[in-house]
Amino acid sequence: MTRRTHVVQSNGISRGPLIDSVRPYPEAIRFALNRMNGSSFWAYSLWRAPEEADLLDDIPLSDEYIQSAGSAEAMTLELRRLEADGSAHQYVIGKPGGEQIANPAEVISWDDGRHSTRVHPHEVFTADEAAEVFYAYFLTDAVPAPYVLRELSLG
């Protein structure tokens, strides 16, 4: 059995280890993201568990993660990471080549429309596009080039 190294969370409440016993990790991530419907399943998060964590005993939270919200057809991706000074920063992930207009115009809704956010057109992902970013994060704990990050002001 493969050692479980990452935690996944659905809708901000249900979490457990990412497993590869049914599908390889890249396909497990893609399968989950493609099930997002914006209604009963509208958010998916992934983070690395601490090295010493026993995911059969405890499912720890983390200050660093990648998350998505929306549906398989249109979702937003965000990265939360700790910077060198220890401060937490959150970013919207975008595809390369997008234009940063003053006010984001694309609306991503989730939880039956109870929540929404506005993003730029290049910050809207399909489930298959998002799966590539999530799997890269799974491997490296980072969002790879050529994707771009736009910092969010959460305060």
Q: What is each model feature region?
A:
Residues 1-46, 69, 80-155:
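Acidic, proline/glycine-rich low-complexity IDRs
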Residues 51-88:
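The feature represents the first ordered module of a protein
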